[in-house]
Amino acid sequence: MKDTSLALHFVSSGTKESLSAQKDLVERYGHVAAEDADIIVALGGDGTMLQALRDFMNTGKPIYGMNRGSVGFLMNEFVIENLPERILAAQMETIRPLVMVAETDDAPPVEALAINEVSLFRQSYQAARIRITIDGKVRLQELVCDGVMVATPAGSTAYNLSAQGPILPLEAPLLALTPVSPFRPRRWGGALLPKHVTVRMDLLETEKRPVNAVADNNEVKSVTSVTVREAPNSQVTILFDKNHSWDERILTEQFRH
């Protein structure tokens, strides 16, 4: 007999493990079309969750993830039993994405949303040279580096963390501006920015030092400038088990050794 206390729509990464989990869950709890669902259940790793967050942005449908992938920082533990009860008891966190506007010399500007981060990185062996402006004021005349990123709290545990950037609580009204292998200023380790600012990054010597920009997995090659800000009127809700909340996850990650 199916437990139908919640109308659930399941999405999976398509791997053998996630498809098997989806089959078992659908048999037990049923499956409805996304537009009829109370909750979206994502099965896979963090990549699957990021895709679900993009797909269901601004639909008002919370997303509950269960880990059937290799990286699952945004996912809950996979347990078949008592899924509706776990969902109803879960903590809700609101994710607000960034919007990137990337300009090039030979094409119209490209606009894309990013749940995790907007990153710039060098195309070749030549280091990137980047001028950074915050709300119209130049804060760094020239950053010489392999790359730089603007990360959301949700993305602060991903690429940002691997580049020695800070981990941010989901509710923190902040963005992390983090360099990748900075050469000059050598001791500049990045900055924490109020979430409402507009960050502009102008690329210098672009013919000699080409740079690509990426909003999560949306890449634009050979950019001349990139503007990043919090996307207005865009949000999605993610659900975490109470015994494994986001706060607990970031504390665990920071004391990992």
From Swiss-Prot:
Domain of life according to the entry: Bacteria
Family according to the record: Belongs to the NAD kinase family.
Pfam families tied to this protein: NAD_kinase (PF01513), NAD_kinase_C (PF20143)
Gene: nadK
Keyword presence, Phosphoprotein: no
Coiled coil found in the keyword field: no
EC category name: transferase
Places the protein is found: Cytoplasm
Protein name as it appears in the record: NAD kinase
Reaction catalysis annotation: NAD(+) + ATP = ADP + NADP(+) + H(+)
Residues spanning the signal sequence: none
Chief place of localization: cytoplasm
GO MF entries: ATP binding; metal ion binding; NAD binding; NAD+ kinase activity
SUPFAM superfamilies: NAD kinase/diacylglycerol kinase-like
UniProt lineage: Bacteria, Pseudomonadati, Pseudomonadota, Alphaproteobacteria, Hyphomicrobiales
Listed GO biological process terms: NAD metabolic process; NADP biosynthetic process
Residues involved in NAD(+) binding: D46, G47, N116, E117, D146, A154, T157, A158, Y159, N160, L161, S162, N218
Catalytic residue positions: D46 (proton acceptor)
Entry cofactors: a divalent metal cation
GO cellular component term of the entry, any: cytoplasm
Keyword annotations: ATP-binding, Cytoplasm, Kinase, NAD, NADP, Nucleotide-binding, Transferase
EC number(s) on file: 2.7.1.23
Function: Involved in the regulation of the intracellular balance of NAD and NADP, and is a key enzyme in the biosynthesis of NADP. Catalyzes specifically the phosphorylation on 2'-hydroxyl of the adenosine moiety of NAD to yield NADP.
